């Protein structure tokens, strides 16, 4: 079913209007992520992350690509999507939560998915100094924020 421009705008704003979904979109600005990477950052169960991603896909903001056991999510590559994100998130690059998310995403990109997806959201179980350091930096950013 094709949406009218008004219906599409409403659907998009509803999708963006949830803080977790907005965080996910801002994370995806830096490149594609697996669902388990997103879940590790937002600290939500895979089923909840999947629901949020489904809403973002329905709104036409995110696409997925299956790669074996993993599903990679990325922003839809169009100027309209980037324009919307810029319009609704001015100053977000200075937000403590967004900064903490970015620190964690950067560290998690270096962890093999098999390893990351096996720790059930408990990043402290990853025996990796870079993750421990990133968790510490993220906590400091949030405390200062």
List the predicted regions and their residue ranges.
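Beta-hairpin "wing" of winged helix-turn-helix
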Residues: 57-67, 74-76
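Amphipathic alpha-helical dimerization/coiled-coil segments
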Residues: 1-3, 79-145
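Residue-level recognition of hydrophobic positions within alpha-helical transmembrane segments
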Residues: 47-48, 60, 97
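Residue-level detection of the helix-turn-helix DNA-binding "recognition helix"
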Residues: 40, 54-58
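Short alpha-helical segments used as structural interaction elements across diverse proteins
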Residues: 11, 18-20, 54, 66, ...
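N-terminal helix-turn-helix DNA-binding core of bacterial DNA-binding proteins
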Residues: 4-48, 70-80
